[in-house]
Amino acid sequence: MTMAAAAVVARGAGARAATAAALRGGCGTAARGRPCAGPARPLCTAPGTAPDMKRYLWERYREAKRSTEELVPSIMSNLLNPDAIFSNNEMSLSDIEIYGFDYDYTLVFYSKHLHTLIFNAARDLLINEHRYPAEIRKYEYDPNFAIRGLHYDVQRAVLMKIDAFHYIQLGTVYRGLSVVPDEEVIEMYEGSHVPLEQMSDFYGKSSHGNTMKQFMDIFSLPEMTLLSCVNEYFLKNNIDYEPVHLYKDVKDSIRDVHIKGIMYRAIEADIEKYICYAEQTRAVLAKLADHGKKMFLITNSPSSFVDKGMSYIVGKDWRDLFDVVIVQAEKPNFFNDKRRPFRKMNEKGVLLWDKIHKLQKGQIYKQGNLYEFLKLTGWRGSRVLYFGDHIYSDLADLTLKHGWRTGAIIPELRSELKIMNTEQYIQTMTWLQTLTGLLEQMQVHRDAESQLVLQEWKKERKEMREMTKSFFNAQFGSLFRTDQNPTYFLRRLSRFADIYMASLSCLLNYDVSHTFYPRRTPLQHELPAWSERPPTFGTPLLQEAQAK
């Protein structure tokens, strides 16, 4: 569990222990099989008659409620800073000599207009080139429909959220624009678990017999929405269609928006509309250069597109900051295919046929492969830190095969942390955790009256879990959580990224010798007190950052 995934637990020392203590089970840990530090009231010290039991349970409920309300102010005093960097793995920047970057959604951020552009262009390609009904043009892009990390069952045409243990979060399964009832989902999958052989492959794709596709990058948001809209049209109009063909046609249309240059030309023609200038990319690059760090850029985007974007956000001298620039790299193939050589581009963008013996500063290279890159630069192992927004295409191979350190750029993190810092969210989550603990302890009472009370609590808990989901996204909830469990997205983020942050500008809050320490989160059989220290590194706490 990472810090963002466990922010409520991480907010203040003793918050969870105090919540557990509110349940009057002594130290609040005995119910989980953990020894109490001192004398504790037995769990079953309750009257035996039904009316007395009912009264006893509701007294415990009210006492826990009061105790929870007293906890909220202390939690509110330890809000997390949305501009902090969070660590999955201990890493010291003093060990990093070389910094690498992706381009899209790493060095440059785009406005909300870009996803509308991609959606509209792909929708029109479906109509004009794949002969889809012109009526689908009535569907517009909804930025609030989907979130990253969702899985799409290609054969059943349903979009869903899956947790780290391959379980579907019920209530987040959508066919078209309508939620699929839980009973139908359970019948469809013979439960809520998705077997490993049905999941997406290593890179999130539906290949080699896998029936699921995982949408991991930010550019996939309009693709998910378009898939859902066209599905909705066919369903509403009782049109028989093959879901596999629909998936492929939408995928090809989204790809063509990139491949045919539709997106690139539109951005270059109105760069101020599509590129957000606010992110302090130049300040980050200048800081690293001033400290003698080597820097390189590896992107799948074309040269002229990158040049115009970087000139806009960094300046026309942007290439002076980088030791190596590689465009149209075709990641993740760049990290695995040893056969493709580099090609140099001249100032006019013409590809040269010279054999590359050295990667020169100020030059732009196309394609190539990582093995040749390592040979020509000598930049190997944990001296290198590479940043990207795509967990699979940017980071997975680098950390698993080459030992590079990796940093994930997760723009959604900032908005989620701002929500998690609100009093309404903190009150709801604190009471939800307390109520869950109360249910866990009081389930030992099996008489009919007690069970009726517990059923009321379970109903309240279910309603609160739905409420916490809607804080982030009405359909799918948080990018990082499915109710109690981490999402499948977070599982991969935790595995492939040493650190993660909302944007590169977060680096400006730390010096170049800073060490990032991951929070020790308790295993189920460990004492919670071991992890309940306030984070002291960098600026994770909002109050500390404001004090500076």
From Swiss-Prot:
InterPro entries: HAD-like_sf (IPR036412), HAD-SF_hydro_IG_5-nucl (IPR008380), HAD_sf (IPR023214), Pur_nucleotidase (IPR016695). Keywords: Hydrolase, Magnesium, Metal-binding. Pfam families: 5_nucleotid. The active site is at D102, D104. It is an enzyme of class 3 (hydrolase). Substrate binds at K251, D252, S253, I254, R255, D256, V257, H258, I259. Mg(2+) binds at D102, D104, D389. Binds 1 Mg(2+) ion per subunit. Residues 528-548 are annotated as: Disordered. CDD domains: HAD_cN-II. Its EC number is 3.1.3.-. One of its GO terms (molecular function) is metal ion binding. Expressed in brain, placenta, skeletal muscle, pancreas, testis, uterus, and small intestine. Reduced expression in pancreatic cancer cells. Its cofactor is Mg(2+). GO terms for cellular component: cytosol; mitochondrion; receptor complex. Belongs to the 5'(3')-deoxyribonucleotidase family. This is 5'-nucleotidase domain-containing protein 3.
